[in-house]
């Protein structure tokens, strides 16, 4: 499944708590709060702190941090501080559970399906054929009703009414994911609506597949690249490449896929559910589709502007001269497409090199770094802002598809991928 710094972290940061939670540390209230406040003051890309009176925030929240009686209380104060900025990529990775329990919680087992919010319904959008959910009979389009007795409507009720739809998608995914996961080999009771009736199943959590990769203090991620061919309604051959995170292990696999698809009538890069990763990789991946060194966007920091440009890939893995792919290029995105994925999709869209299909992406496109705090927690803090070559700021906006395709339960239940179908139809039209 598609789950889960130079540097763009994206929803990889959202998934940061989805792994093994380590034993708790002493909370060190004032020292930890002051360290986090100072790091942000000194590194925020906007000296005006996005319009927030930063000293006033310290004056208000500092005493609360000093009075904190547990790690959980301290984290609540720091998260309150981070929330005042109104930006993504400011977060905490706890060194232990908020309740102070010392026993580690293993969240390395995955039930093998993914979900998205459609209105007030949480729908299964994808099922791993090798996962526990597939073995139990779960199908795309089913509505998830409860996890281990916890009703989904109760989780949704915890979201603030003022929260934007874009953030609701991200937050409910995070809340659900942390409950779906658990130790490998364990089981989780789930209730679904299959479109006709309620279905209760017990699903085994299995080990994730893919090439393990680690970044900083984040849990291990598993890199997966899938590539194959599809036929358009008119019989054209289209290559479809999908990967789940921007990590170095993707590059040789992506290049191999491109080498096999150079004669295709079109290529689709599927970034649905891809939360981001290493920002610098967008320069190399885009170079498979651009002949010249072309600006993709600019990362604006407090001290400098870092320009991202496509690095044309003119030699293949065998050392042979090649031309970047010049045919039609479609990019698929959804509500869980974040960070580096947004920079790539938005950058290629702004250049007119790709057409984007799907649902508006996360709008969480800030570059971020890690800093260890005195209590052992890790602060994720944004240090720059990214704008595409045409000046479009992706933070808080997301990549808006050229062709918006609403998530439909009827499509999912029938096995139809409407976003992919729209991209295939468009590629057909380019061959006229």
Locate predicted features.
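N-terminal export leaders
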Residues: 3-8
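Mature N-terminal segment immediately following signal peptide/propeptide cleavage
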Residues: 26-51
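Terminal peptide-recognition signature
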Residues: 36, 81, 113, 133, ...
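Extended, small/polar residue-biased N-terminal targeting/export presequences
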Residues: 48-120, 183-229, 431-432
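PDZ domains, with a preference for the canonical peptide-binding region formed by the helix
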Residues: 67-73, 140-189, 252-255, 281, ...
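PDZ/PDZ-like domain segments forming the peptide/carboxylate-binding groove
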Residues: 104-154, 247-248, 384-385
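Conserved PDZ fold ligand-binding element
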Residues: 135-166, 241, 268-272, 356, ...
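Cleft-lining beta-strand/loop regions that shape enzyme active-site pockets
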Residues: 182-374, 412, 426-430
């Amino acid at each position: 499944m598609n789950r889960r710094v130079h540097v763009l972290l994206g929803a990889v940061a959202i998934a940061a708590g989805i792994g093994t939670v380590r034993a708790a540390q002493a909370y060190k209230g004032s020292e930890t709060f002051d360290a986090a406040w100072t790091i942000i003051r000194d590194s925020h890309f906007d000296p005006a702190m996005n319009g927030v009176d930063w000293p006033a925030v310290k004056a208000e929240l500092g005493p609360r941090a000093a009075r904190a009686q547990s790690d959980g209380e301290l984290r609540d104060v720091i998260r309150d501080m981070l929330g005042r900025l109104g930006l993504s990529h400011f977060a905490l990775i706890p060194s232990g559970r908020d309740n102070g329990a010392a026993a580690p919680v293993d969240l390395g087992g995955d039930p093998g399906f993914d979900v998205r919010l459609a209105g007030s319904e949480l729908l299964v959008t994808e099922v791993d054929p090798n996962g526990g959910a597939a073995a139990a009979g779960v199908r795309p389009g089913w509505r998830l009703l409860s996890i281990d007795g916890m009703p989904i409507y109760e989780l949704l009720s915890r979201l603030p009414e003022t929260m934007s739809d874009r953030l609701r998608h991200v937050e409910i995914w995070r809340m659900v994911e942390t409950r779906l996961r658990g130790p490998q080999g364990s089981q989780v009771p789930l209730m679904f609506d299959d479109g006709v009736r309620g279905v209760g199943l017990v699903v085994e959590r299995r080990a994730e597949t893919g090439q393990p990769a680690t970044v900083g203090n984040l849990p291990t991620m598993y890199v997966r690249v899938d590539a194959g061919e599809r036929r358009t309604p008119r019989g054209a051959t289209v290559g479809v490449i999908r990967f789940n995170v921007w990590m170095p292990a993707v590059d040789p696999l992506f290049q191999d896929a491109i080498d096999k698809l150079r004669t295709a009538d079109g290529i689709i890069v599927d970034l649905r559910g891809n939360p981001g990763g290493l920002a610098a990789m967008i320069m190399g991946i885009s170079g498979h589709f651009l002949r010249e060194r072309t600006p993709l966007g600019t990362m604006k920091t407090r001290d400098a502007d870092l320009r991202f440009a496509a690095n044309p890939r003119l030699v293949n893995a065998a050392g042979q001269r090649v031309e970047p792919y010049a045919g039609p290029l479609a990019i698929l995105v959804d509500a869980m497409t974040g960070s580096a994925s947004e920079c790539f999709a938005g950058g290629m869209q702004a250049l007119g090199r790709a057409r984007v299909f799907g649902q508006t992406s996360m709008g969480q496109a800030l570059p971020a770094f890690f800093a260890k705090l005195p209590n052992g927690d890790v602060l994720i803090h944004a240090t720059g802002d990214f704008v595409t070559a045409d000046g479009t700021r992706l933070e808080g906006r997301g990549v808006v598809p050229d062709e918006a395709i609403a998530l439909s339960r009827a499509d999912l239940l029938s096995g139809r991928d409407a976003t992919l179908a729209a991209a295939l139809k468009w590629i057909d039209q380019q061959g006229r």
